[in-house]
């Protein structure tokens, strides 16, 4: 019926947030707990979840979500949780707690063993989906600031489910030739919507390059293109910006995003605001990078602030016309090696709502000047 139905603006997407209880503001948007709860409650056939790791029992709200998943699985709803091979620390406990949930570990880069499953998304019944930076952990559901998008528009959910099929093909328990055959089957039909064919002003982008499939957009290409074409403003809220790629303990310079930010500020006079995280999960290069941007662009309209509470929000807004929400840092290792899906939109309402979130965070008491 989709070809004959009008496409709703923004593909029925709503912003979703987790805000820790110790923050000095609240959100008007759906909470991550409410989003996951709704997906589970409305599911009739299946729920597919992709996350680097799975540790929902670490907080009360996370445990409630996992208990609801357990109840759904006991009613016959098919539940599959994809985890990265290196993120399965709590797998035994979860399997014993709920044997009806199918946990599958994946290795998206068996050849070099450097890539991780970094994507955070849920899909149910080809009807509802979530994509953002909330992994399936108690912290992301309750105590760590995150941002994502929920939609109950079936065409968009179906398109995200194709990504799940791709990642699932890299089941670490299977032989390599089975992985390759499975991937070959799912990649040619990997997407219906992309930068040249968004649906309701919405499309997904993907990483890494070897998982793109037919007509998918490489996330790096889209992000850099938007940064390079920025005319008036760039707002970035990220855990980290790291212009390096790490392989086997060695670091290599990867300046693509870093240079695009500097060029926008110095060459084109674009107003840039950068809000970075500052907690123990930060790369050691993160604060050095923030300080270098601040110093290099001291004569330009570039401002840097540090968010003092655990903040895993990863948000980019360009010219108040485009929004990008992802699970990856602006980090060479993430963009060159890891598997993830990002949300993109040019829908005016969605961009406006994301902008309000950035403005709220930027002026909050939790945002401190880098110079303090």
Swiss-Prot record:
It catalyses: a 1,2-diacyl-sn-glycero-3-phosphocholine + H2O = a 1,2-diacyl-sn-glycero-3-phosphate + choline + H(+). One of its GO terms (cellular component) is viral membrane. A motif (YPPL) lies at residues 153-156. GO terms for molecular function: phospholipase D activity. It comes from the Viruses. It is a lipid-anchor. InterPro entries: Diverse_PLD-related, PLDc_3, PLipase_D/transphosphatidylase. The keyword Lipoprotein applies. Its EC number is 3.1.1.-, 3.1.4.4. This is Envelope phospholipase OPG057. The gene is OPG057.
């Amino acid at each position: 019926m989709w070809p004959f139905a009008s496409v709703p603006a923004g593909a029925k997407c709503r912003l979703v947030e987790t805000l820790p209880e110790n923050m000095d503001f609240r959100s008007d948007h759906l909470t991550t707990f409410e989003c996951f709860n709704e997906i589970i409650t409305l599911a009739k056939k299946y729920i597919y979840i992709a996350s680097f790791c799975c540790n929902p029992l670490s907080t009360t709200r996370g445990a409630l979500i996992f208990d609801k998943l357990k109840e759904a699985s006991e009613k016959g709803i098919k539940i599959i949780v994809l985890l990265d091979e290196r993120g399965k620390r709590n797998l035994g406990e979860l399997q014993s707690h709920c044997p009806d949930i199918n946990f599958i570990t994946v290795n998206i880069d068996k050849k070099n063993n450097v890539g991780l499953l970094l994507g955070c998304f849920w899909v149910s019944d080809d009807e509802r989906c979530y994509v953002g930076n909330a992994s399936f952990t108690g912290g992301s559901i309750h105590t760590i600031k995150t941002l994502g998008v929920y939609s109950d528009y079936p065409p968009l959910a179906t398109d995200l489910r194709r990504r799940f099929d791709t990642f699932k093909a890299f089941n670490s328990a299977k032989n390599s030739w089975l992985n390759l055959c499975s991937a070959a089957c799912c990649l040619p039909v990997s997407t219906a919507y992309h930068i040249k064919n968004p649906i309701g002003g919405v499309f997904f982008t993907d990483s890494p390059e070897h998982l793109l499939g037919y007509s998918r957009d490489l996330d790096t290409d889209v992000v850099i293109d938007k940064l390079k074409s920025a005319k008036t403003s760039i707002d970035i809220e990220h855990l980290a910006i790291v212009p390096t790629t790490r392989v086997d303990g060695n670091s290599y310079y990867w300046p693509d995003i870093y240079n695009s930010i500097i060029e926008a500020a110095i060459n084109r006079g674009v107003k840039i605001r950068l809000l970075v995280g500052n907690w123990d999960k930060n790369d050691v290069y993160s604060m050095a990078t923030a300080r270098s941007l601040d110093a290099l662009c001291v004569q330009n309209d570039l401002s840097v602030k540090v968010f003092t509470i655990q903040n895993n929000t990863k948000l980019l807004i360009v010219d108040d016309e485009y929004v990008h929400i992802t699970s990856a840092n602006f980090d060479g290792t993430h963009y060159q090696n890891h598997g993830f899906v990002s949300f993109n939109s040019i829908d005016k309402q969605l961009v406006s709502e994301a902008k309000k979130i950035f403005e709220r965070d930027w002026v909050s008491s939790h945002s401190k000047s880098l110079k303090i």
